[in-house]
Swiss-Prot record:
Organism annotation: Haemophilus ducreyi (strain 35000HP / ATCC 700724)
Residues annotated for ATP binding in this entry: 14-24
Gene: queC
Pathway membership: Purine metabolism; 7-cyano-7-deazaguanine biosynthesis
Single GO MF annotation: ligase activity, forming carbon-nitrogen bonds
Protein's recorded name: 7-cyano-7-deazaguanine synthase
Transmembrane spans: none
Cofactor note as given: Binds 1 zinc ion per subunit.
Residues annotated to bind Zn(2+): 190, 198, 201, 204
């Protein structure tokens, strides 16, 4: 492949959550459905609903899904997403942070993508509401992009449409993409694996806060 020519295909790192599903709709809008794939990682997460949602959405939208087992990470690190530990703040970041997870996801995605002739990688990381996760920062993504390009001598382009959006703005983007109700109804965010959300974990609270803020804003606009 001519490295100066951008492939007209894209792959989305996909968990079945609000952020990655919004990114999927963004990719579909830009690249067309037939040119988009998703990749999902089984890393030993404490519940299966995340994987089930991702599989259902991919099938429902007619998107090719590849599932990669990276559960070996459980053998070398521990946190509240892969154990039954109580979710809490642990110093400057919550104990739901999985060391190396996004670096691992991007590496495996890049390896797969190169084999498929895909250069554009979408990931739903966000620096605005990132809960203190260091691997959700823009500086990390840019660094990883350079590293992967050098490591594989390939012109990857890592896209982060949500990087500087609040959760309210992420809901607004889903609405602009015509996917608001789909994302609201079909995606899973809860750390505890509760269908429809537990309404108490940090992830649920952030999602609901953003949703309520966006709905209030929309309602205000209609009343003007």
């Amino acid at each position: 492949m001519n490295r100066s020519t951008r492939s007209h295909k894209a792959i989305v790192i996909f968990s079945g959550g609000q952020d990655s599903t919004t990114c999927l709709f963004q990719a579909i809008q830009e690249f067309k459905r037939e040119n988009v794939e998703v990749i999902t990682f089984q890393y030993g997460q404490r519940h299966s609903i995340e994987l089930e949602k991702a599989a259902w959405i991919a099938q429902n939208l007619g998107i090719k899904q590849t599932v990669i087992d990276t559960s070996v990470i459980k053998a070398i690190t521990t946190n509240a997403l892969i154990t039954e530990a109580t979710i809490k703040q642990d110093g400057d970041k919550p104990n739901t942070f999985v060391d190396g997870r996004n670096a691992l996801f991007l590496l495996y995605t890049a390896i797969y993508a190169k084999g498929q002739g895909i250069q554009t990688i979408f990931t739903g990381v966000c620096e605005t509401d990132f809960s203190g996760y260091p691997d959700c920062r823009d500086i990390f993504i840019k660094s990883m992009n350079v590293t992967l390009n050098l490591a594989m001598d390939y012109n990857f382009n890592i896209r982060t449409p949500l990087m500087y959006l609040t959760k309210k703005q992420t809901w607004a983007l889903a609405d602009q993409l015509g996917a608001f109700e789909y994302v609201r109804e079909h995606t899973h965010t809860c750390y505890l694996g509760v269908e429809g959300g537990c309404h108490t974990c940090p992830s649920c609270l952030l999602r609901e806060k953003g949703l309520n803020e966006y709905l209030a804003e929309k309602s205000g606009e209609k009343n003007v």
